[in-house]
């Protein structure tokens, strides 16, 4: 099953739990045990929900830091959970390129949210990626001035 479908199924689970005030993992366990009319949850959807739950405090902190004028609790539930999924993918899932995480979040927001959501989501996620890139130093080769003098021969 495509990862896009898995993201959407994870979003459905996170959104439903959020709206009900239910714990993410307890609803996930219900969905795994009794998928109802839908096909069983894809493994990647389960991984997303568990990952978002495990890192929720840090994810929400990142969202609060990088969203101007909007705290997580004030965001629309659908936008909040789209952002949580993409932030988890950006910060905790090295298998997904940052650009893909952002593009997938934008696709979900264009279909499921209001007209202002895609630009808001893009801005927040771009800021998170920029902060992540700033924190992870790029390795650069040493030039001659960085070498220890004992390594140089006369």
Swiss-Prot record:
Keywords: RNA-binding, Transcription, Transcription antitermination, Transcription regulation
Organism whose genome encodes this protein: Bifidobacterium animalis subsp. lactis (strain AD011)
HAMAP family: NusB
Tagged with keyword RNA-binding: yes
Listed Acidic residues bias regions: 143-154
PANTHER family, alphabetized: ANTITERMINATION NUSB DOMAIN-CONTAINING PROTEIN, N UTILIZATION SUBSTANCE PROTEIN B-RELATED
Gene3D superfamilies named in the record: NusB-like
Family from the record: Belongs to the NusB family.
GO cellular component: cytosol
Cited InterPro entries: NusB-like_sf, NusB_fam, NusB_RsmB_TIM44
Name by which UniProt lists this protein: Transcription antitermination protein NusB
GO molecular function: RNA binding
Any Gene Ontology biological process: DNA-templated transcription termination
Region (Disordered) location: 132-154
